[in-house]
């Protein structure tokens, strides 16, 4: 299994996004968490990836953060892992951060903007045939 594949579920494959340089910011963030906090995300991801299409998780665990660009967040405790669903039943985790307040701060909103740009980068690179081919 490639180092960018996080979880291969019955319904979805969950992957870490790689930028053009091969960096995986969300994976690096995840690896810096204590094991019990990693396990919390592991459990949420496995549940969603193994569930039938159309399964909805509670908003306390998985929430739509940007409806226009279909950006979601896995929400293990006070961490947020931005992601989106794409063709081939893939969930791509782009970036992550530790939430500090009830509402999204300006810093959180700026991160969301970079997540949207990364999503667009992923889609362009996949369409151009130089995302998976480059990292194979």
Tell where the protein language model's regions lie, with residue ranges:
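Basic, Lys/Arg-enriched alpha-helical interface segments
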Residues: 1-78, 88-90, 98-136
